[in-house]
C-alpha cells in the first residue's frame, strides 16, 4: 500500500496518533473557515477533548453504541448546566449532583468509568459558552461534534486496519525481546541479586501490563470475524506462549556455575537469547508496519544447546535451557501457537445497572468515594472562583478535572507537568500576541502547534501542554478578541486548580497503595493456590491452565505496582516497605515456578496421585500460613483461627522430577515469605486501614 519509507512514517505510533487527532480537530475549523463560520469550527474543537477523555476513540465491538451514549451524556450535562444555572442553582450543588449521579459508571467497568470526567468536562465547557449563544447551540455542537468524531475515527481505523491493537502487540514483542536478552545475560553473570532482580521485575511488569492491555483490546473487538482480527488473535496467542517460556526460571545458581565451568554453555545460552531477542524485534516491526514475516530458523543455536544437554545429563540447567528454547524456536519458526485454546473463554461482562447501583450506594464503594472526592474538589474550586469574583470559574474547574488521576503519584506528576506547561505556554502566547499576526498565518501556526503537541503528548505531557495552552489562547483571541486579558487570570486559575487537586488527593479519602499491600498480597496468594490446584489435578486442561497462569501473573503485577506506588507516597515507614519488597521478590520467584509447572502439566508430566496430593496439601498449608500472617495482628490474637505449622516434606526415593523440584522450591519461598511478613508486621503503620484487625474487614 505504501513504499517502505512512507510505511515506516505513516504507521509510526506517535505520527499516526498525531495525524488522527490533528485532522479530527482541524478539519471542522477548515470547513468553518471556507463557509465563513470560523467561530463554529473553533467551537467544534471542544468536543474531541471530551471524546478523548471518554475513550470514544477506542476500537470496540459496540463502537457506535458507546458513541450514542457519550453524545447523550454530553448534551444532557450541557442542558442541565444551562437550565439549573438559569434557575439560580448554586454551581457547587450542580457539580456535586452531576458527579454523584454519574459516578455509578465506574461500577459498570473501567471503560465506562471514563464517561464521568468526560461528561463533567462537557458541563464545564458549557459554563464558558453560557450567555454567548442560545441554549440549544451547545447541545447541537456536542451532538454533531461527537458524531463527526466517531465517524472520522471509524473511517480512520478502517483504513489503518486495527492500528491501535497492532501498536500494543508490537510493544509487547519488543518488551519480550528486551526481557529475554536481559534475563539470560544475567543468568551467566555474577551479579548481586539485589541489583540484578529489580530491572528484571520492571521488564516483567511491563510485559504483563501489555498482555493485559492486548487482552482487553482483543475482547473489545471479539465480535469481529475478519481476517485481520484472526491474524492479530493468533499473534497474541504466540506472545502468550513466548512469555510463558521466557519468564520461567530454574533458580539453581550452583548448577549454572558448574555447567559454565565444564562447558561453553555461557556463550551458547547467550547466543540463543540474543537470536530470540533479535527475531522478536523483527516481528515487532512486521506487526507495526503491516509486513508479512520472513522465514526463520535457529537450528544451529538449538543444536548447540542440545549437545550441551546431552554431554551433561546430570546437570538440569542444560536440559532446562534446551527444552524452553526449543519451544520458543518452534513458535518463532512456525508462527503458530504451541497449543489450541479459547482465548476469550472467560468473557468479561459488565455489571448490570441495578447491581452496579446497589454496589455504588455502599459507603465502602471505591467508585462512590472517588465521586465524592471529585465533587468536593469541584465545589471548592467553584467557591474559590466566587471568592475571587470570577464571573465563570471554568478554568479552575477544568484544571482540577484534568490533573486528577488515579493515585497520588500519577496526580502529583500530572500537576507538575500541567502547571509548568501552562505557565510556559501562557508566556509564549503573551509575547506572540503583541505581533498582531494575520488570521491566516495564525491558523497555520495553530495547526503546526497542534500537530507538534500531539506528536510528543504520549512521551512528554508537559511540553504538549505548552502547545495546547498556546492554541487555547489564540482560539479565544479568534473567538472573542480577549486573548491578552486571558493570560494572567488563567495562570492564577491553573495554580489554584493544581493546589485543590493535590489537596483533595492527599486529604479526601486517599486511596494509599501502601494500605492495599496486604489485600493485594492476600489476593496473589489465592491465585497461586488455585494455580497449584489445577497443576496437580488429575487431568489439567490447557484453557483453564492458561487462564489461571495469566491470573497469577496479573495478581503479582498488581502487588508489584502497589509496592512501587507505595514507595513514592509521603510519610510511610521505609522499613516496612523494605521488608515487603523482599516478600514481593519471593512472590516473583513463585510466579516463575508456576509458569514452568504450567508447561509441564499441559504436557501431562504429572506426579503420581498420592505424591501430588501430598504436595498439594503442603502448598495449601504453606499458603494459608502466609495468608493468616497477613490477616491477623499477631499469633494468639486471631481468636478461633488456627495458625498452622508448615509440614516437613519427606524426601522420596529416587531423583526428584522437574515438577517436584519446582514444588519444593515453591514451598521454600512460601516459608521464607511467612518469616518476612512476621518481621514486617512489627514495622506496620498504626493508623487508618491498618487499625483493622482482620484483612477481610478492609478488603472493600
Swiss-Prot record:
Keywords: Cell membrane, Membrane, Transmembrane, Transmembrane helix. Pfam families: FUSC-like, FUSC_2. Its main location: membrane. InterPro entries: Integral_membrane_YCCS_YHJK, Memb_transporter_dom, YccS_N. It is a multi-pass membrane protein. It is found in: Cell membrane. One of its GO terms (cellular component) is plasma membrane. The chain crosses the membrane at residues 24-44, 67-87, 89-109, 115-135, 139-159, 383-403, 420-440, 461-481, 491-511. Belongs to the YccS/YhfK family. This is Uncharacterized protein YhfK. The gene is yhfK.
